[in-house]
Amino acid sequence: MNILLSRILKYLNGTLFLDDAYRFCVFFILHYQDFDSYTIEDISGELQTTPECILKFLKYLGFDNYLSFIEIYQRHKQVRFEQIQERMKNIHVSSYVERIKVSNDNEAFLKKIEEVYTKIHDSKRVILVGALYPMSIAVEFQTDLISFGKTVLQYHTYDKDMIFMKMTMLSLFLHQEDH
């Protein structure tokens, strides 16, 4: 299901412009858990833009108005949470590690996974940096973490505010190895 959050992330991750649409997407991610508590006027004031500029972007996403956007946000937020809950039932990380065979020492590999998990948990936000292909599959990772309240953004060199936000952050570098 191409939920609203993943559509926003696909736009945000792929855009080359620091414009009102980009700022709206970042605002959406930063305030995802309680986004429906904001009016379009609140958001336009915060972003120093107009409601019309926001509505123009929402029309680009296929929405006729802000209310329909909020209704889909609420529905998709609930659906995504239920999807994650269902996926996590009876999951055993060790069995996945056995099947993918990335290491000869599964215990050491599981320990590394736990270290990464702890770093993600302890950070206020996660910034993804990397090549196009690994970034394209990272949208699932982003939607899961954002759904649980963790801010996850892709790094864009043109967004100077991203570098200097005053919060604990973890940067993950994603790359593709040629074999």
Regions found by a protein language model. Name each.
Residues 1-3, 145:
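N-terminal-biased segments
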Residues 3-7, 15-26, 30-37, 41, ...:
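HTH-adjacent hinge/linker in prokaryotic transcriptional regulators
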Residues 111-124:
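Glycine-rich phosphate/diphosphate-binding loops that line cofactor/substrate pockets in enzymes
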